[in-house]
Amino acid sequence: HSVSAFCNAGIDILGDHSLCDYAVNPIINITTMLLIILSGIGFTVWFDVLENGRKVISREVPRRWWFTRLRLHSKLAVIMTALLIVSGTVFIFFAEYHNPQTLGGMDPGQKLLAAMFQSVTTRTAGFATISQGALHEESKLFCAILMFIGGSPGGTAGGVKTTTVAMLFL
């Protein structure tokens, strides 16, 4: 699953339940989310972030200038990725909070983790820790929008790309 998560392939070797058995396991969820995010944000963004981070560490530039020195593409990719993860997490969390077939049986922290995992993986890799068929209709629609947007240019995810959507709203 780690290779599939990093490549955003969505290949699931666990059968028809995907990662549902690990819905409340923070180590598996966080590790998988990090792999998905890092590969979906794009390798050009990685290079830009690492190059500017190196300059901050070596004190070539002040730390407060770090984000402002990123290329426009990198800024849009980072901001849109964060915005989509947060908005998806909040939407799924509240829409599915009382649904006994998805988040309803979990404690609030587990619900937040599962909602965040769903938000991250829907845009790119396609894994699931909650039943996709049991989602409320509004959650399915929001997930379809996230799928349509996908990841960032230069990454391994599909979709119309985060920067394209950002440019539509600017």
Locations of the language-model features?
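Membrane-proximal intracellular helices of multi-pass ion channels
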Residues: 1-170
